[in-house]
């Protein structure tokens, strides 16, 4: 290791070694559209049940008439300074995509980029251990991985899962009349930006961490409810971005009750201090034309990039009580944030 390497693990603040944080590192939806516009002939496989057409949370491949294999990957730069916690959050976030399809994880492979001439290998070990801890909590093995020397720390997982095809949930299959539920509060981008700006108070340091370390394992149980018509997780594109994917995929309009959207404690306080991540502006620039006129305050909430955010559920009114009972049984507050209806305007999301 060079003389520029940090020798004391206690003095290392991982967020100072990256230009972005967590899912806020995501390439904006608009730029991503350009990247994915392939010039090659379209190749199809009838067994690929879910690919990239709807930008769903994971790919699903039909193994037989009953079982599908789910494949996904997610990785990003540090969103917290503690290496173990960073690894745990990154892994929890990656595993979430399996649950968002209604499946259960089977195993994971680690993805690690590390500036070996700037940061000790012992710190990378703690990051990987954090990922291993999340895998253990999900009941799976961290079965291997791949690493490269990179200018900034990067960590995540490639995760394989399985799903009973009768339980498969997608992000583009919602129906008019569905009610919208969110399983975690919004505001992770705001609080982690407060940390990066050194405004976060010590007593608030675990608010976002606790939310990001919570596995979305409830998704596998939600998927067994027949009246759940669509399911996705809310991550880097913010609540508005992922809700738009649901609306556009099903050709519906969301009637959103912004006052009902749950927020993390203290999120509004830090928002008032200007703690708005860059990803918020990139998100709005990418899809703001599909939203109603918003105040800066509303933009900051709806477009706030989440890392390891909650599940967004579209459920029929007939099955709503069953969903509420399930969430209550697992100590998740059931919060309805709106509904879906047949479009009456060009906006995909309207506020009520």
Swiss-Prot record:
Q: Which Gene3D superfamilies match?
A: PurM-like C-terminal domain, PurM-like, N-terminal domain
Active-site residues, as the UniProt record annotates them: 23
A molecular function GO annotation: magnesium ion binding
Which reactions fall under this protein's catalytic activity? hydrogenselenide + ATP + H2O = selenophosphate + AMP + phosphate + 2 H(+)
Q: Which InterPro entries match?
A: PurM-like_C_dom, PurM-like_C_sf, PurM-like_N, PurM-like_N_sf, SelD_I, SPS/SelD
**Domain of life here?**
Bacteria
A Pfam family it matches:
AIRS_C
Q: Where does ATP bind?
A: 26, 54-56, 74, 97, 145-147
Q: Name a single GO cellular component.
A: cytoplasm
Record field: transmembrane: none
Known EC number: 2.7.9.3
Site residues by UniProt (Important for catalytic activity): 26
Q: What SUPFAM superfamilies would the database entry show?
A: PurM C-terminal domain-like, PurM N-terminal domain-like
Instruction: Report the enzyme's class at the first EC level.
Output: transferase
- Which keywords describe this protein according to UniProt? ATP-binding, Kinase, Magnesium, Metal-binding, Nucleotide-binding, Selenium, Transferase
The protein's role, per its UniProt record = Synthesizes selenophosphate from selenide and ATP.
- Record-linked PANTHER family: INACTIVE SELENIDE, WATER DIKINASE-LIKE PROTEIN-RELATED, SELENIDE, WATER DIKINASE
Output this protein's name: Selenide, water dikinase
The organism's lineage is: Bacteria, Pseudomonadati, Pseudomonadota, Gammaproteobacteria, Alteromonadales
């Amino acid at each position: 290791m060079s003389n520029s390497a940090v020798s004391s693990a206690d003095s290392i603040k991982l967020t100072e070694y990256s230009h972005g944080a967590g899912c806020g590192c995501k390439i904006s939806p608009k730029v991503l559209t350009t990247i994915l516009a392939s010039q090659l002939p379209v190749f199809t496989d009838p067994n690929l049940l879910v690919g990239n057409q709807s930008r769903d949370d994971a790919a699903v491949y039909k193994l037989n008439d009953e079982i599908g294999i789910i494949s996904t990957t997610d990785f990003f730069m540090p969103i917290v300074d503690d290496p173990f916690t960073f690894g745990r959050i990154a892994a929890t976030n990656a595993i979430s995509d399996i649950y968002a399809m209604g499946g259960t994880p089977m195993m994971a492979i680690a993805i690690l980029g590390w500036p070996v001439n700037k940061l000790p290998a012992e710190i990378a070990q703690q990051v990987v251990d954090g990922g291993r801890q999340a895998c253990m909590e999900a009941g799976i093995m961290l079965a291997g991985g791949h690493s490269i020397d990179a200018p900034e720390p990067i960590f995540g997982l490639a995760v394989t899962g399985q799903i009973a095809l009768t339980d498969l949930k997608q992000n583009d299959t919602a129906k008019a009349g569905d009610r919208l539920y969110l399983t975690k509060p919004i505001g992770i981008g705001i609080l982690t930006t407060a940390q990066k700006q050194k405004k976060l108070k010590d007593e608030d340091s675990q608010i976002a961490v606790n939310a990001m370390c919570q596995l979305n394992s409830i998704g596998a149980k939600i998927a067994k409810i027949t009246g759940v018509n669509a399911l996705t997780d809310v991550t880097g594109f913010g609540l508005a971005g992922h809700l738009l994917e649901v609306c556009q995929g099903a050709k519906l309009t969301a009637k959103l009750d912004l006052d009902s959207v749950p927020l993390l404690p203290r999120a509004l306080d830090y928002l008032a201090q200007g703690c708005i991540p860059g990803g918020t502006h990139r998100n709005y620039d990418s899809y703001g034309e599909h939203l109603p006129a918003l105040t800066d305050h509303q933009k900051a909430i709806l477009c706030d990039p989440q890392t390891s955010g909650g599940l967004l559920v579209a459920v029929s009114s007939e099955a709503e009580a069953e969903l509420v009972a399930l969430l209550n049984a697992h100590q998740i507050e059931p919060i309805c944030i709106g509904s879906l209806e047949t479009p009456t305007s060009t906006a995909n999301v309207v506020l009520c």
